[in-house]
A protein has these predicted regions:
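N-terminal beta-strand motif that seeds the catalytic metal site of vicinal oxygen chelate
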Residues: 7-41, 96-105, 152-184, 234-239, ...
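Conserved small-residue-rich
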Residues: 166-215
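A cross-kingdom feature marking solvent-exposed beta-strand/loop segments within repeated
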Residues: 55-68, 86-100, 118-135, 159-160, ...
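Conserved acetyl-CoA-binding loop of GNAT-fold acetyltransferases
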Residues: 46-52, 119-121, 189-195, 255-257
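Vicinal oxygen chelate
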Residues: 3-21, 26-35, 70-78, 91-166, 169-178, 198-199, 208-209, ...
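Conserved active-site tyrosine of GNAT-family acetyltransferases
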Residues: 40-45, 115, 183-188, 251
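Amphipathic N-proximal alpha-helical interface segments
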Residues: 80-87, 149-154, 219-227, 285-290
Length: 292
């Protein structure tokens, strides 16, 4: 394997050169459930300068068993998918509930074959194409620790960056896990990942960062794992920016608040600053400045 430090994404990623290894190019988007789609779209527009890129009605299916409607919002170089189910039981219009993560692969058919050979199952027999022209296929969550993920092949023409907050990429999805060592091993074994760091947190929890392809996951074992109802629970998203202090100021001008006045530096050299969830629709997000 070849270690790549810094570079375009400012992240030490692990690129595997062995035949049969799975290539994840980037995290395309995070998906959120909401009981009020229009309100959620308006929040991204106001907070991040997002642009609505498309959406519409959704038939009942794996992503939303009751059906409903969705919208894609784009800001900087990233996007979010917002889903309003017909059955809104347990949802609040004030809260964005994390639903799934979408990973980009260069060739979805090859990725399906490679992942199937590794023991993964999928929620359908073949991919579908969404309103943005993206070809995607959800994993069967029984083979992904109970959390929803899908692989995505982007259309041939790249999407130009949008106006709004200058987000460079989604650096990672974060999950709370019952057993940190088992979770690390799963990503290493299943996705050919590399455990690059971690340790105790200020709250007494433990975390670990695992890179696979050109993406990353943060795994967090709480102080009392027995309180978790599932082995893996979606926890947060990290947005990479070039100038974190400038982005903090821009976010504050849009009414967002942060948990501290200045970023802290984590065990792998990333500068991180979380939003106050009272101002981010109850969902945990942070800005990240990647090491050079």
């Amino acid at each position: 394997m070849e270690m790549i430090g810094g570079g375009e994404i400012g992240l030490a990623v692990v690129r595997h050169q062995n035949e049969g290894d799975i290539v994840f190019d980037k995290i395309q988007h995070m998906g959120y459930l909401t009981s009020d789609l229009d309100r959620a779209v308006a929040w991204f527009e106001k907070s991040f300068g997002a642009v609505k890129g498309g959406g519409g009605p959704l038939n009942p299916g794996y992503a939303m068993p009751s059906g409903g409607r969705n919208a894609y919002v784009q800001f900087g170089n990233v996007e979010a998918e917002l889903l309003e189910p017909t059955d809104k039981t347990g949802l609040s219009g004030d809260i964005l509930t994390m639903h799934h993560v979408g990973y980009v692969v260069p060739d979805i058919n090859r990725a399906i074959d490679d992942l199937t050979a590794r023991g993964f199952k999928f929620a359908a027999d073949k991919p579908n194409v969404n309103v943005l022209g993206q070809t995607l296929l959800y994993f069967d969550s029984t083979t992904t620790n109970g959390v929803r993920m899908h692989i995505t092949q982007l259309p041939g023409e790249p999407t130009p960056p949008n106006n709004g907050l200058e987000i460079e990429r989604i650096v990672h999805a974060g999950y709370r896990v019952k057993d940190l060592e088992e979770a690390i091993k799963w990503y290493v074994d299943k996705f050919g990942g590399s455990h690059i760091g971690g340790g105790p947190s200020r709250t007494g929890a433990r975390n670990a960062f695992v890179n696979f392809g050109q993406v990353q996951v943060e795994l967090i074992e709480p102080t009392d794992p027995a309180t978790m109802g599932a082995d893996h629970i979606m926890d947060h998203v990290g947005y990479a920016v070039g100038d974190i202090l400038s982005c903090v100021g821009e976010c504050e001008s849009h009414g967002l608040k942060f948990v501290a006045d200045t970023p802290n530096t984590n065990s792998i050299g990333q500068q991180v600053l979380y939003f106050e969830t009272d101002t981010s629709m109850g969902s945990r997000m942070h800005l990240t400045r990647l090491p050079d």
